[in-house]
Design a protein with these regions (language model features):
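Long amphipathic alpha-helical segments
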Residues: 1-67
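Glycine-rich oxoanion-binding loops at beta->alpha junctions
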Residues: 74-76, 115-136, 181-182, 197
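Short, acidic/small-residue loops that bind anionic groups at enzyme active sites
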Residues: 69, 157-180, 196
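Glycine-rich phosphate/diphosphate-binding loop of Rossmann-like nucleotide-binding domains
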Residues: 85-128
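C-terminal binding/interaction regions
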Residues: 172, 176-220, 229, 234-236
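Glycine-rich phosphate-binding loop
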Residues: 132-170
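Short glycine/serine/threonine-rich phosphate/pyrophosphate-binding segments
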Residues: 33, 98-103, 127-128, 147-157, ...
Length: 236
């Protein structure tokens, strides 16, 4: 779908991948952004706009059914709530400064139909705060861990739970290794099994978590459709 001479919209992405296209506000000219969002809104029930600064919200004045989540800088355009899939995502944040990126991931996972639970400010500097929250991992299909500074919470959680864990490094921290660099490298070098996305990539973490959780939910609802293989067996 073409929008003037500056955009070609992928309106079939959700049908192909199960994941909607999210409009990145950052870096776009105001009039380009507005025209893209309006064009999507004519074709899709809901449109997500990420990294939208609060002072740009006025650009969409007059458009119906807007929900702006300031902490996550995420705008949702659309009236119909997304259908529930049964997917379950737990989001942990090491510190309060990591919450905005964690919230971006949470809201995106919810937009893909998942139920979410959160536990914030449970970082390793006071690791006793973490342990009571891990009971929720038994409920979850996948866990997202948002952490800045040294990023240690991601590898720690991945070594404690039997669910897929997505590490979400956050650009908190300063000096050598600051702005999320140390957190990213720590998560990439983890010896515990940890999937890692880019710095501040809350949208990507939320999309990937929802994709995993929704597949698990489908298997939970139809347990007989795919029989598990015995250890060492190969499917014909």
């Amino acid at each position: 779908m073409r929008v003037s001479d500056f955009a070609k919209l992928d309106v079939a992405r959700e049908a192909r991948t199960g994941m909607p296209e999210v409009v990145l506000a950052e870096g776009k000219l105001d009039h380009h952004l507005v025209e893209i969002v309006k064009a999507f809104a004519t074709r899709k029930a809901r449109v997500l706009v990420s990294r939208l600064a609060p002072d740009r919200l006025a650009l969409f004045e007059g458009m119906p059914h807007l929900a702006y989540h300031e902490s996550a800088r995420l705008l949702v355009v659309g009236k119909e709530a997304p259908p529930r899939t049964g997917g379950r995502v737990l989001i942990l944040a090491a510190g309060t400064a990591d919450v905005p990126v964690a919230e971006e991931a949470r809201l995106v996972a919810q937009e893909l139909g998942c139920e979410t639970r959160v536990a914030y400010d449970v970082g390793v500097a006071g690791i006793h705060r973490l342990f009571p929250e891990l009971d929720a991992a038994d409920w979850a299909d996948v866990v997202i861990v948002a952490a800045g500074r040294e990023g240690a919470l991601g590898p720690v959680v991945a070594g404690l739970v039997d669910r897929p864990v997505i590490g979400l490094p956050v650009s908190t921290g300063y000096g050598m290794g600051g702005k999320g660099e140390a957190a990213l490298l720590s998560m990439l070098q983890a010896c515990s099994p940890l999937l890692t996305v880019n710095i501040d990539a809350g949208v990507v973490a939320g999309l990937c978590a929802a994709q995993i959780a929704n597949r698990v939910a489908g298997a939970r609802e139809s347990p007989g459709e795919s029989e598990p293989l015995e250890s060492g067996a190969r499917r014909a």
